[in-house]
């Protein structure tokens, strides 16, 4: 990737051999090769999580276009999750390719949803959160979420079709509410302090990828595509 990774403490440029996921951290014993500053365990943990999800998606959907696309889908969602936790932002450089990737996959194979459902899902995903955003702003004068959340839900709609949106919104909202209340009660998180919504949308997207059939059945909805029916 450009620019090359550097140690935030001493500025040492990370070489290719020092940047092998998980293995490099183990070989370096969790420290920068130059200044010996400890490297947070979060880095290899995120790398391991990404690898496990990517491998699971290929195992789940097979080693083909759909499985590889799903692996990339998982990688982008993990990246968006931790970027949003750190910065309260969901960059267009990730959300927009995710959206177009879902449309392209369904255009070429219809593996996740028919193209018409994917296009409607992208539009409905964006407009649903956009509407909530402006309604909340009109009522309170504050911004309840960011535009990146709209684009992420649009991307999930492009992947799974409009039928999956109610389940995705419900799952992410419930999990987000539980986490938010827990932070306020147990960790003295300020009521006016923002809580990122992107990670919970991403989690709901992963749930739809692996367990879409069960989720839709549990909510009394028909699974729109054969891929969802194979979930789990």
What are these language model-derived features?
Residues 1-42, 197:
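Membrane-proximal soluble regions of multi-pass membrane proteins
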Residues 19-27, 166, 170-179:
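Hydrophobic, aromatic-rich membrane-embedded alpha-helical segments
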Residues 40-47, 92-94:
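Select subsegments of transmembrane alpha-helices in polytopic membrane proteins
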Residues 45-83:
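Zinc-dependent deaminase
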Residues 53, 57, 61, 104-105, ...:
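Alpha-helical membrane-inserting segments
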Residues 67-175, 217-232:
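Functional transmembrane core segments of multi-pass inner-membrane proteins
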Residues 147-148, 181-207:
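Interfacial loop-to-transmembrane junctions
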Residues 186-194, 214-223:
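Extracellular/periplasmic helix-loop-helix junctions in multi-pass membrane proteins
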């Amino acid at each position: 990737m450009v620019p090359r990774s550097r140690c935030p403490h001493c500025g040492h440029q990370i070489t290719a051999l020092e940047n092998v996921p998980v293995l490099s951290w183990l070989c370096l014993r969790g420290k920068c090769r130059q200044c010996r500053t400890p490297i947070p365990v979060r880095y290899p943990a995120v790398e391991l999580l990404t690898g496990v999800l990517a491998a699971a998606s290929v195992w789940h959907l097979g080693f083909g276009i759909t499985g590889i696309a799903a692996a990339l889908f998982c990688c982008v969602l993990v990246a968006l999750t931790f970027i949003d936790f750190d910065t309260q932002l969901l960059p267009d450089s990730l959300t927009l390719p995710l959206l177009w990737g879902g449309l392209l996959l369904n255009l070429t194979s219809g593996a996740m949803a028919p193209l018409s459902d994917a296009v409607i899902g992208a539009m409905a995903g964006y407009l649903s959160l956009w509407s909530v955003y402006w309604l909340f702003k009109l009522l309170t004068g504050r911004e309840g979420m960011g535009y990146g959340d709209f684009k992420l839900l649009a991307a999930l709609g492009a992947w799974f079709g409009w039928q999956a949106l109610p389940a995705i919104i419900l799952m992410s909202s419930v999990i987000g509410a539980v986490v938010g209340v827990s932070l306020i009660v147990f960790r003295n998180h300020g009521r006016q302090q923002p809580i990122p919504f992107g990670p919970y949308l991403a989690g709901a997207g992963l749930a739809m990828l692996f367990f879409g059939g069960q989720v839709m059945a549990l909510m009394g909805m028909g699974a729109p595509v054969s891929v969802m029916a194979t979930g789990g």
